[in-house]
Amino acid sequence: MKKNTKISVIGAGFVGSSTVFALMNGGLASEIVIVDVNKDKAEGEAMDLSHGAAFVKPVVVKSGDYKDTEGSDIVIITAGAAQKPGETRLELINKNYNIFKSIVPEVVKYNPNAILLVVSNPVDILTYITYKLSGFPKSRVIGSGTVLDTSRFRYMLSEHFEIDVRNIHTYIMGEHGDSEIATWSLTNIAGMDVNEYCEASCKKCDGSLKYKIYDDVKNAAYHVIEKKGATYYAVALAVKRIVEAILRDENSILTVSSLLEGQYGIKDVYMGVPSIVGINGVKDIIEVPLNDEEKNNLTDSAKTLKESLDSIF
């Protein structure tokens, strides 16, 4: 990892500020710039975070405008409007499209060589919009995708099986949203297919249990929002993990939102799929062997995203 790494975060809300906190704790940057339309909010977050500088690796955290982001290695976009009660998904997309039309050109102007990491929702749609607005190669425009959803899936499986979450391997793929799919056919524990492990461990693993776990994963954000108003800690850790893979050139396989160009029979859509992530962004997309039901569900997820995109482009 290079010594002097600069990261800029656009958006000083819950997700943006939590992301900066996670990046600081991970020692992943020597400079972090926070930009927000509310300059006082950005300045306040930078001050608060900077006051903890004595407890982490050397890092300068400051607020600024787009000019101050110049020379960033990675620009993380967390800004955007939140969905209001009664507001349709399409209305939210159009609102955020207009916001991104003001953000992305400014980011590109000062950071022509940066990797753009989109976190704002709906993340797959906004990552595609960022790709189109930026003119960057697809490898350098990435969405947080289903990295968090995959972590939620592994966690819930670990709770059921009473196994360390790090020893459970599986993916959530597709849209970061209601049409996402769980790859049960690929789920393995201790090198065993999940069904084999169920038999070996005498744990319940029937269709109803699988559906409940999948449903809990899919609706996890709604449950958290109902309890505390917003989700931000776990997504910040997911973003930190993606940034880590990029800066350390790990070639890690993460379900980031990547541009599909024929993989899985899907074209011209950004969605969460297993991708090799390294110093230059997305190095490659891995086509994992899904069963027929999973393939069909992934295709349906892509159609859902495509319909939203067709309303804009």
UniProtKB/Swiss-Prot annotation:
Positions annotated as active site in the UniProt record: H176 (proton acceptor)
Binding site for NAD(+): V15, D36, K41, Y66, G80, A81, S102, V119, S120, N121, S144
Swiss-Prot/TrEMBL keywords: Allosteric enzyme, Cytoplasm, NAD, Oxidoreductase, Phosphoprotein
GO cellular component entries: cytoplasm
Binding site for beta-D-fructose 1,6-bisphosphate: R154, H169
SUPFAM superfamilies per UniProt: LDH C-terminal domain-like (SSF56327), NAD(P)-binding Rossmann-fold domains (SSF51735)
Subcellular location: Cytoplasm
Enzyme Commission code: 1.1.1.27
Reaction(s) this enzyme catalyzes, per UniProt: (S)-lactate + NAD(+) = pyruvate + NADH + H(+)
GO molecular function annotations of the record: L-lactate dehydrogenase activity
Top class in the EC scheme: oxidoreductase
Keyword Oxidoreductase in record: yes
Positions where Phosphotyrosine occurs in the chain: Y222
GO BP term, pick one: lactate metabolic process
Superkingdom classification of source: Bacteria
Activity modulation comment: Allosterically activated by fructose 1,6-bisphosphate (FBP).
Pathway(s) served: Fermentation; pyruvate fermentation to lactate; (S)-lactate from pyruvate: step 1/1
Gene3D superfamilies: Lactate dehydrogenase/glycoside hydrolase, family 4, C-terminal (3.90.110.10), NAD(P)-binding Rossmann-like Domain (3.40.50.720)
Residues noted as binding substrate in the record, renumbered to the chain: Q83, R89, N121, P122, V123, D124, D149, T150, S151, R152, T231
Subunit structure: Homotetramer.
Family listed: Belongs to the LDH/MDH superfamily. LDH family.
Function: Catalyzes the conversion of lactate to pyruvate.
Name the record gives this protein: L-lactate dehydrogenase 1
Organism: Clostridium acetobutylicum (strain ATCC 824 / DSM 792 / JCM 1419 / IAM 19013 / LMG 5710 / NBRC 13948 / NRRL B-527 / VKM B-1787 / 2291 / W)
